[in-house]
């Protein structure tokens, strides 16, 4: 190697013809701020999501309570409908028996009247 080659400053990397690059400390601070901003944004989104989940849980709980009340009402309705059906079945049976007895009495009267 020659002595002149040692005194020549090294060539600048390709594409660096513009202003000097900022110190690495400023670049890392900027990256840190960007990362912190992204973290803050994610934290805000997660808070909103947690609030939505809590609201959804509350609505589901209310819906479950309403479903339980509806189920209880349906059971009560089914019981009272069965009692009412039984009541009218007996009432209908009594009317049929009474009608049968009346027809039998009329038939007996007709038979006795025409047989003499």
Swiss-Prot record:
The chain crosses the membrane at residues 95-114. Keywords: Acetylation, Cell membrane, Coiled coil, Cytoplasmic vesicle, Membrane, Phosphoprotein, Synapse, Transmembrane, Transmembrane helix. Nervous system specific. A higher level expression is seen in the brain as compared to the spinal cord. Expressed in hippocampal neurons. The modification N-acetylserine is found at residue 2. Phosphorylated by PRKCZ in vitro and this phosphorylation is increased in the presence of WDFY2. It comes from the Eukaryota. The record marks 58-60, 66-67, 76-77, 81-82 as: (Microbial infection) Cleavage. PROSITE patterns: SYNAPTOBREVIN, V_SNARE. One of its GO terms (cellular component) is terminal bouton. Residues 1-28 are annotated as: Disordered. Residues 2-94 are cytoplasmic. Coiled coil: none annotated. One of its GO terms (molecular function) is SNARE binding. InterPro entries: Synaptobrevin-like, Synaptobrevin/VAMP, V_SNARE_CC. Part of the SNARE core complex containing SNAP25, VAMP2 and STX1A; this complex constitutes the basic catalytic machinery of the complex neurotransmitter release apparatus. Recruited to the SNARE complex following binding of the SNARE complex component STX1A to STXBP1. This complex binds to CPLX1. Interacts with POPDC1 and STX4. Interacts with VAPA and VAPB. Interacts with WDFY2, PRKCZ and PRKCI. Interacts (via N-terminus) with KCNB1 (via N-terminus and C-terminus); stimulates the channel inactivation rate of KCNB1. Forms a complex with WDFY2 and PRKCZ. This is Vesicle-associated membrane protein 2. It comes from Rattus norvegicus (Rat).
């Amino acid at each position: 190697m020659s002595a002149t080659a040692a005194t020549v400053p090294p060539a600048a990397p390709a594409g660096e013809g513009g202003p000097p690059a900022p110190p690495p400390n400023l670049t890392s601070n900027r990256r840190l701020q960007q990362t912190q901003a992204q973290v803050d944004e994610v934290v805000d989104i997660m808070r909103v999501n947690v609030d939505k989940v809590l609201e959804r849980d509350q609505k589901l709980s209310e819906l479950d309570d309403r479903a339980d009340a509806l189920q209880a009402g349906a059971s009560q309705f089914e019981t009272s409908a069965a009692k009412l059906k039984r009541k009218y079945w007996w009432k209908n049976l009594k009317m049929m028996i009474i009608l049968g007895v009346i027809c039998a009495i009329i038939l007996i009267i007709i038979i006795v009247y025409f047989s003499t």
